[in-house]
């Protein structure tokens, strides 16, 4: 079996159908003894240029190992599904399992947001402690 990288873009109005589509495609691959090495749902993203007067699309990336029969079925499924506005199937030499640059960047942003939230949550507590100390010093000096 050969290794493939598949990217398909779904019409942005049909984003809620993406999970069902992914499930159908994974079932198709698994039924033919194929393996899914990486599956990433990138979500709605801005297109580089308009396609069919659309400026956004829902992206999905899959790295799979499957026989040619499955690839042919996926190609026909993409072709006859009006919701899929673009797709690309590329053969690769090896299985790719590490996170893509898109997913890695998304994970970094998520981690950065968590750190900022922790810093913001900790800052008011420190400020309150400082103001309590200042008030107690003022009260001590008045006495």
Curated annotation (Swiss-Prot):
The keyword Ribosomal protein applies. InterPro entries: Ribosomal_bS6, Ribosomal_bS6_CS, Ribosomal_bS6_sf, Ribosomal_S6_plastid/chlpt, Transl_elong_EF1B/ribsomal_bS6. Residues 105-143 have a biased composition (Basic and acidic residues). Transmembrane segments: none annotated. One of its GO terms (biological process) is translation. CDD domains: bS6. It comes from the Bacteria. Residues 96-143 are annotated as: Disordered. Keywords: Ribonucleoprotein, Ribosomal protein, RNA-binding, rRNA-binding. Pfam families: Ribosomal_S6. The keyword Nucleotidyltransferase does not apply. SUPFAM superfamilies: Ribosomal protein S6. GO terms for cellular component: cytosolic small ribosomal subunit. GO terms for molecular function: small ribosomal subunit rRNA binding; structural constituent of ribosome. PROSITE patterns: RIBOSOMAL_S6. NCBIfam families: S6 (TIGR00166). Binds together with bS18 to 16S ribosomal RNA. HAMAP family: Ribosomal_bS6. Belongs to the bacterial ribosomal protein bS6 family. This is Small ribosomal subunit protein bS6. The lineage of its organism: Bacteria, Pseudomonadati, Pseudomonadota, Gammaproteobacteria, Alteromonadales.
